[in-house]
Amino acid sequence: MAKLKLIKIDGSFETEPVKLSPGLIAKELKQQPVFDAVLVEQASWRQGTHSILTKGEVRGGGKKPYKQKHTGKARQGSTRNPHFVGGGIVFGPKPNRNYSLKLNKKAHTAALHTVWSEKLASDNTHLVDQNLFNKTEGKTKVMMQFLKSAKLLDKNVLFVVNTLNTNLEQSTSNIKNVQVKHLDKVSVRDLMLANALLVEKEVLKALEGKFK
């Protein structure tokens, strides 16, 4: 049975580890939903505001470049034609394209369950509580000292909480490699990018309800 230890403000651990409910660890790790979930998230970032100039939108070229006959060249009516350098683009991208993809709820839950299972079984995942958050007093200096004591300074740290704490948010806001996320806002990609995961104890109960 998987176990997690509660980490304290001085970087040490509680002696008694917390046993995880069997339902938190997926019986089967499904990688395809994980891939799909990350793809959907990244696709949602695309704004679709790209825009090229068509032949009718390129400035200039209103005058015929040279006379119709007796030049030995093919006849041309405008330098805005697509085959001229600086001319309009044919069938290029225009704004308001929707790049978003869809993933059904069951597949998204399977993706989260798979990634959470891998993280909860990892040695880089620990438990935290509101007591630790309050002891930071909202100070970056105290949080930095905690990360140093816990040997997490050089890692991408993700705090996952069930209740947002002002002291925690303030103490981590100026630290580049530290993120604080509410459980409902954590994505598959967030979990995968985290080298160290610090999970509030109450999150475990919420996850049991989500994955049962």
From Swiss-Prot:
Record's keyword annotation contains Glycoprotein: no
GO MF terms held by the record: rRNA binding; structural constituent of ribosome
Gene Ontology CC annotation, any one: ribonucleoprotein complex
Compositional bias segments (type: Basic residues): 61-73
Entries under SUPFAM superfamilies matching the protein: Ribosomal protein L4 (SSF52166)
Signal peptide segment: none
Entry-linked InterPro entries: Ribosomal_uL4, Ribosomal_uL4-like, Ribosomal_uL4_dom_sf
Function: One of the primary rRNA binding proteins, this protein initially binds near the 5'-end of the 23S rRNA. It is important during the early stages of 50S assembly. It makes multiple contacts with different domains of the 23S rRNA in the assembled 50S subunit and ribosome. Forms part of the polypeptide exit tunnel.
Record-given protein name: Large ribosomal subunit protein uL4
The organism of origin for this protein: Mycoplasma pneumoniae (strain ATCC 29342 / M129 / Subtype 1)
Record gene name: rplD
